[in-house]
Amino acid sequence: MKILVSKKITLDLFCKNPIQIIEKEKNEIISISKNKKTVFYVIQPKALKKLFDIKEYFVKSKITKKEKKIIEKFPMHTNWIPDKDFIQKAALWGISLNEEVSKYELASFISYWEAEGLFFHHIQWQQKLARSLERSRSMNNAIQQKKDITYIPVPDQKTPDGFRGK
């Protein structure tokens, strides 16, 4: 913060006319001190915007649009697609996917998260998709195994070892 401070003022001087001091300062950051120790900083909204404006950061640094897209958080949209090496990345995250994402699975995922309106990084969206696929595919496998609705379970008449029998 010290690098960004344009002016150091004592607390007594600041308390006499704070509005005039703030309006006069061009750098928008003032250090207020008492007994040669900083008590607090006055940071104007313009300075905060400069500090935290991601667009300005990307203008200053020469980052490509593709890199910018991956770095920023964004809400889910209909044109979103996972990376080409999505299956390999999922394996690194401990999620074993045997087949590629179908267009129906992707459409279902996108429509759900589009409605939510939450913001995540591209990598986070991919992780969410991988977990979603893992859950839905495992549920589909379980449902396929239980397809025979006419099956009536019959208990066996064996008494396990260690239990009292008849």
Curated annotation (Swiss-Prot):
UniProt keyword DNA-binding present: yes
Which domain of life does the UniProt lineage start with? Bacteria
Please list the GO biological process terms of this entry.
DNA replication, synthesis of primer
Gene3D superfamilies linked to this entry: 1.10.8.1180
One family from Pfam that matches here is: DnaT
Q: Does the keyword Glycoprotein apply?
A: no
Which UniProt key words apply to this protein?
DNA replication, DNA-binding, Primosome
* Gene Ontology cellular component annotations, sorted alphabetically: primosome complex
How is the subunit organization of this protein annotated in UniProt?
Homooligomerizes. Interacts with PriB. Component of the replication restart primosome. Primosome assembly occurs via a 'hand-off' mechanism. PriA binds to replication forks, subsequently PriB then DnaT bind; DnaT then displaces ssDNA to generate the helicase loading substrate.
The record's function comment reads: Involved in the restart of stalled replication forks, which reloads the replicative helicase on sites other than the origin of replication. Can function in multiple replication restart pathways. Displaces ssDNA from a PriB-ssDNA complex. Probably forms a spiral filament on ssDNA.
Similarity-based family? Belongs to the DnaT family.
Q: Protein name, please?
A: Replication restart protein DnaT
Natural source organism: Buchnera aphidicola subsp. Schizaphis graminum (strain Sg)
